[in-house]
Amino acid sequence: MEDAKVGDAVPARSHSTMLSPLPVYDHVGVGFGPANLGLCIALHESQEARARDFQMCFLEKEPQFAWHPSLLLPGAQLQVSPMKDLATMRDPTSAYTFFNFLHTEGRLMQYINREEKVPSRREWSAYLAWAARHMAAYVRYAHEVTDIVPVQRDGQCLYRLQCATPSGARDMYARNVSIAVGGA
């Protein structure tokens, strides 16, 4: 899969002042659960990031998106308001709100008409997976970060992320890093 920037999928910039010819991302997220998924969506929708040619990548050790698969028990409900989704508090008009998910899946009316106003954990998991599919250009699955090392170059602080991937070890460089690896 190609490296992605906000707005479309193109390779990150290479800089001649780098320690290596590898691309430098403006942001790399470690883990791709709800926290970094929400950040990815916010950056994807950011006009400022788009104007700056902001380059980002998210690294997830699992081979595909999954939110607490062992806790998706029949009848288990989400414990928070669905308004605390990936985007509503930041931008209620976002295409990535829970209610837009229900609308695009043809289930909004059914959800509104049911007695229970809190989604099931299975429904919430489906929403998160739907959003993750929309952000697929920014994610590298089966990439486990094994080390993060700050490096200096020409007075600029960068972070070298060492990754274990199915094809072997790989280094990546970023100006900023978010770590949201979830519970064990």
Q: Where are the regions that the model predicts?
A:
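A conserved short coil-to-beta-strand element within the FAD-binding core of flavoproteins
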Residues: Y141-Y159
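A short, basic/flexible loop-to-alpha-helix module at the beginning of a structural domain
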Residues: V6-V24, E48
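N-terminal Rossmann-like FAD-binding beta1-loop-alpha1 element of flavoenzymes
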Residues: L22-C57
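Glycine-rich active-site loop/strand segments that organize a redox cofactor
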Residues: V6-S14, Q55, L59-S125
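A structural motif corresponding to the C-terminal end of an alpha-helix
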Residues: A131-R140
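Short hydrophobic core segments
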Residues: V28-V30, V145, L161, R170-A184
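Alpha-helix termini
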Residues: T17-M18, H44-D53, R153-D154, S167
